[in-house]
Design a protein with these regions (language model features):
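Glycine-rich phosphate/diphosphate-binding loop of Rossmann-like nucleotide-binding domains
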Residues: 172, 183-188
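Short glycine/serine/threonine-rich phosphate/pyrophosphate-binding segments
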Residues: 171, 200-204, 313-320
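Short, acidic/small-residue loops that bind anionic groups at enzyme active sites
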Residues: 216-224, 266, 308-309, 315, ...
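Acidic/glycine-enriched connector segments
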Residues: 23, 27-28, 32-41, 47-48, ...
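C-terminal functional extensions of proteins
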Residues: 297-299, 333-399
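Structural motif
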Residues: 195-196
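Active-site donor-nucleotide binding/catalytic segment of nucleotide-sugar enzymes
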Residues: 154-168, 185
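Long, compositionally biased, glycine/small-hydrophobic-enriched stretches that function as flexible linkers
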Residues: 1-135
């Protein structure tokens, strides 16, 4: 059965899986992703390839491409001269984004892709670059769905989003609170997802990454990170993160669940690539499109959301999430937990707007979703027990 390979039976993403189908004599209707078919080339001359989609596979023989096309296949090549894959078949790992760190912040793979992004027009790229970026983001979508489907099938736990200010310094009270929430949620079997930036987002992934260690180990890690508290100095900030990563519990054998307790998920964007990469998530779904990225985070986090203090970006996420809850766009929502009473009732009193808004939802009075607290224990309990029964079925990036 194809399920022996992964949770996407119509997609072939390894040579072993390809060989399995070749032995059956048919690739008809399948999608073959990201395989190096120029290495020990498989014999495709007699296999059925009608309606087979080859995406970003390395095929160096033009006659083979022509033959596959004549026989009913569609071949979408990996676009050349890009620093990034135009159809990634898996999510990024911290090691991918940090590659080249010996040459400083500017040498990081993550930074080099960001410089490429800016040099080619950023969010307003020319048609060729825009196409390459869209193909890349589609590949991330697909890899993320595979990852979440596998995790949900094996775990069944809810996905919880943690939002908040990117400028929150390492070692601050809010940073420590977010890290502790991330740790406790991971221990409770939840998947922590963040926007993949620094500040509160880094803290939550760090907490999840330390969730298999003793609680006091997290304090030690934060104390060490606090030696490089702000991301203005990308070199020092990244160097300290890499040092602390060496002190994290090892992930061990890869499976569909364990990674959630070794950092969880982050969903960053190269639109904000001037900020150092958050290197504490175990799986990283990095997009070029910030609009897709924002929607993806909120679509996944059906189990609930934590909003630590933040400014414009966080407030945008608050009301985008509220809109989704109001119209049940992605199904029922878990609780909205606002951490820092003074900030959310005084500085930016969103509670006064959200409660009457959500009370008038066509799906009933949803004002009860809104909670404001300073208590980490209360926040975690609300999230652990507040996920809707439908969360398991709706925490996907696509229907």
């Amino acid at each position: 059965m194809t399920e022996a390979y992964d949770h996407s039976p119509d997609e072939v993403e390894s040579r072993e899986e390809l060989d399995y189908h070749l032995a059956k004599g048919s690739l008809a209707g399948l999608t073959i992703q990201g395989l190096a078919l120029d290495r020990d080339p498989p014999d495709l001359s007699t296999v059925d390839v009608s309606n087979t989609l080859f995406v970003a596979c390395r095929i160096t023989d033009p006659e083979l491409v022509a033959d596959l096309t004549r026989r009913g296949a569609i071949v979408v090549p990996d676009l050349h001269n890009r620093l990034y894959p135009t159809h990634p078949s898996r999510l990024y790992a911290p090691e991918d984004l940090a590659a080249g760190h010996r040459n400083g912040f500017e040498g990081l793979y993550d930074t080099r892709v960001y410089r490429h992004f800016v040099a080619h027009g950023g969010a307003l790229a020319d048609i060729r670059e825009a196409l390459a970026q869209r193909l890349h983001d589609h590949g991330i979508d697909d890899a993320l769905n595979d990852t979440i489907d596998a995790w949900t099938a094996a775990s069944g736990g809810p996905v919880i989003g943690v939002m908040g200010g990117h400028a929150e310094p390492r070692g601050s009270r809010a940073y420590r609170h977010a890290a502790e929430i991330g740790r406790r949620l991971a221990v409770a079997g939840c998947l922590v997802v963040t926007g993949g930036g620094p500040g509160v987002m880094e803290a939550a992934n760090l907490g999840a990454a330390a969730s298999t260690a003793q609680p006091e180990h997290l304090t030690t890690l934060i104390d060490q990170l606090a030696a490089a508290p702000r991301f203005d100095d990308g070199d020092a900030y990244t160097r300290k993160a890499l040092e602390v990563r060496e002190l994290l519990p090892p992930e061990g054998a890869a499976d569909a669940v364990a990674w959630a307790r070794h950092g969880g998920l982050s969903v960053p964007t190269w639109l904000y690539g001037h900020e150092p990469a958050n290197l504490f998530a175990a799986r990283i779904a990095k997009y070029f499109s910030n609009a897709i990225r924002e929607d993806t985070i909120l679509r996944l986090a059906r189990g609930g959301l934590v909003f630590a203090a933040g400014r414009a970006g966080t407030v945008q996420e608050v009301f985008q999430a509220a809109t989704k809850a109001f119209y049940a766009t992605d199904g029922a929502s878990g609780p909205f937990v606002f951490l820092d009473t003074e900030f959310w009732t005084g500085t930016l009193p969103v509670e006064k707007l959200l409660r009457p808004l959500l009370a008038d939802s066509p799906y009933g009075d949803l004002a009860k979703l809104v909670h404001v607290t300073d208590d980490v224990d209360e926040a975690v309990e609300l999230l652990r027990h507040g996920a809707p029964a439908t969360a398991r079925d709706t925490q996907r990036t696509t229907p």
